[in-house]
């Protein structure tokens, strides 16, 4: 893990990039509902729901909205039946792309995702064509100016797999099953993370630049804009210098 550019490990999160607060809430509500449906409405015994609730409270979602989302998941209230579907493909430069969706209509979603790939220089792949290139990990994020030495000591003592200074943040990586216990240990040590979640980290990265990088980022942007897409992961690496150039010309 150590040594990856911050651009190679970034997870594109629609909730953080959407301009409208309503879109953030829509995605959080879906995650809460699906998590409750999958593992029950008690966050004490449902780690996925616990993570979703942490995000919701962090976004200042009201308790009433959260409770309704949980009840829709447990069946106490009627609601849309969302299904989790992952799509895979390749972008410009041969970059592997993994797309996590929550949809109430798989036919619509797969058609829209395929259309984005074909129109933006990519190719949609079959199931399993890309997923093996990513590893599921727990991710705990601290601001760049946090006490890295204290985080490193507390995280490794709690069983974290790695601690990486990625420039704009300090990232703690854990086995998926250890995420909650490591968060609790860090908080007990007086270290409050900005965010904790499950993520997909590329096993290897492909460096892209110039026109390929521009086309790739545009493809990812269009995928992110789709209403059914929750998360997009890609195994690319763009140097800081190239990213600065792209930002200056965008």
Curated annotation (Swiss-Prot):
It is found in: Cytoplasm. GO terms for cellular component: cytosol. InterPro entries: Integrase-like_N, TACO1_YebC-like_2nd/3rd_dom, TACO1_YebC_N, Transcrip_reg_TACO1-like, Transcrip_reg_TACO1-like_dom3, YebC-like. One of its GO terms (molecular function) is DNA binding. Disulfide bonds: none annotated. SUPFAM superfamilies: YebC-like. GO terms for biological process: regulation of DNA-templated transcription. Pfam families: TACO1_YebC_N (PF20772), Transcrip_reg (PF01709). It comes from the Bacteria. Keywords: Cytoplasm, DNA-binding, Transcription, Transcription regulation. NCBIfam families: PRK00110.1 (NF001030), PRK12378.1 (NF009044), YebC/PmpR family DNA-binding transcriptional regulator (TIGR01033). Belongs to the TACO1 family. This is Probable transcriptional regulatory protein AFE_0059. It comes from Acidithiobacillus ferrooxidans (strain ATCC 23270 / DSM 14882 / CIP 104768 / NCIMB 8455) (Ferrobacillus ferrooxidans (strain ATCC 23270)).
């Amino acid at each position: 893990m150590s040594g990856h550019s911050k651009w190679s490990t970034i997870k594109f999160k629609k909730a953080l990039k959407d301009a409208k607060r309503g879109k953030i809430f829509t995605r959080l509500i879906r995650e809460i509902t699906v998590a409750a449906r999958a593992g029950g409405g008690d966050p004490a015994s449902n780690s996925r729901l616990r993570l979703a609730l942490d995000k919701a409270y962090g976004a200042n979602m009201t308790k009433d909205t959260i409770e309704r989302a949980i009840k829709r998941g447990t069946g106490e209230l009627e609601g849309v039946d969302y299904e989790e579907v992952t799509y895979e493909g390749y972008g410009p430069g041969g970059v592997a792309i993994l797309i996590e969706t929550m949809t109430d209509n798989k036919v619509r979603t797969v058609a829209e995702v395929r259309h984005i790939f074909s129109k933006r220089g990519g190719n949609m792949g079959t199931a399993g064509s890309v997923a093996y290139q990513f590893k599921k990990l727990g991710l705990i994020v601290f601001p760049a100016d946090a006490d890295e030495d204290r985080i490193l000591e507390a995280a490794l003592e709690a069983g974290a797999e790695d601690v990486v200074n990625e420039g704009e943040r300090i990232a703690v990586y854990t086995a998926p099953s250890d995420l909650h216990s490591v968060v609790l240990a860090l908080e007990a040590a007086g270290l409050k993370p900005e965010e904790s979640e499950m993520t997909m980290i590329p096993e290897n990265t492909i460096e892209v630049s110039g026109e390929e990088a521009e086309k790739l980022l545009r493809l990812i942007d269009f995928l992110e804009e789709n209403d059914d897409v929750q998360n997009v992961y890609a195994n690319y690496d763009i140097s800081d210098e190239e990213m600065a150039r792209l930002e200056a010309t965008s």
